[in-house]
Amino acid sequence: MIMKLMRTVSVAVTGGTGQIAYSFLFALAHGDVFGSDCSIDLRVYDLPGLERALSGVRMELDDCAYPLLQSLRVTTSLEDACDGIDAAFLIGAAPRGPGMERSDLLKRNGEIFSLQGSVLNVCAKRDAKIFVVGNPVNTNCWIAMNKAPKLNRRNFHSMLRLDQNRMHTMLAHRAEVPLDEVTNVVVWGNHSAKQVPDFTQALISGKPAVEVISDRDWLENIMFPSIQNRGSAVIEARGKSSAGSAARALAEAARSIFLPKDGEWFSSGVCSDYNPYGIPDDLIFGFPCRMLPSGDYEIVPGLPWDAFIKNKIQISLDEISQEKASVSLL
């Protein structure tokens, strides 16, 4: 019997004892991100003091007997977790507590992601791909990117896939079509209540969504704010933030990059340098992207903005710019 040689990727996951990581780790080890022909050298990191919880995560991963999980270590050393990695999933972040202003949250997480970026700069492979999940995600990603100048700025991504998935589902349900009939779902800007779920680009059964769903009032005043505020709605209903859906979205976001489908559009917060839409450089901004044969991505060019979308994009841009200014001295 001839054994097929597998490639191996070294992967770090932070916030390893949290809810999102708990769901994501099993998808990762199963092959949902890198495919069934790729073995994984997995490092799961969380803060000192969480060793016992990390050991429980390790037990469960071991007990799953995943064939693709070549090696596994749990650690409270960020340097150990990031040593020689090909990819990092930065999930851990400080949550917003009672009475905490957004500026306080930005400062606290700014310190966390400054450290993580600095460690990645020293320890990760130069071509490592970095996926940031911890909120406020665009600004956290920007901080990490700027603290890791030895890494390619184009390899930093902040997650907008959950917003894309939410919009995808709402459009499909409204049009009463299967999910795979909805394509070109685009989310611009910041992952916040000022994100821009752009229904004007979406297609339903190959036709513009605005033709299939002719009720513009529903698109602008029901669907649009529903996507913007979905995270808060989940917290209000469940008592906890999105976890399973966020983990699923993270796996899909990474898979779109590592195992792309021809012509697939995906929304991602990426470095805005030299973008085709006039967004200022040196931001992490949500754009529609697609993968190229070279393994790099491009921002999908030439998409028109109507007056409604253009105004909403400016609002989101203003928010990201203000967040950047508030942490730029970290």
UniProtKB/Swiss-Prot annotation:
EC number assigned by the record: 1.1.1.37
Protein residues bound to NAD(+): 15-21, 109, 116, 133-135
User: Where does the signal peptide begin and end?
Assistant: none
What is the main EC category here? oxidoreductase
Please provide the record's keywords in A-Z order: NAD, Oxidoreductase, Tricarboxylic acid cycle
What does it do? Answer: Catalyzes the reversible oxidation of malate to oxaloacetate.
- The name this protein carries in UniProt is Malate dehydrogenase
One record GO biological process: tricarboxylic acid cycle
What is annotated as the active site? 191 (proton acceptor)
Reactions catalysed: (S)-malate + NAD(+) = oxaloacetate + NADH + H(+)
* UniProt cross-references to Pfam families, sorted A to Z: Ldh_1_C, Ldh_1_N
Q: Which family does it belong to?
A: Belongs to the LDH/MDH superfamily. MDH type 2 family.
Name the Gene Ontology molecular function terms of this record. L-malate dehydrogenase (NAD+) activity
**Binding-site list for substrate:** 96, 102, 135, 166
| Organism of this sequence | Chlamydia caviae (strain ATCC VR-813 / DSM 19441 / 03DC25 / GPIC)
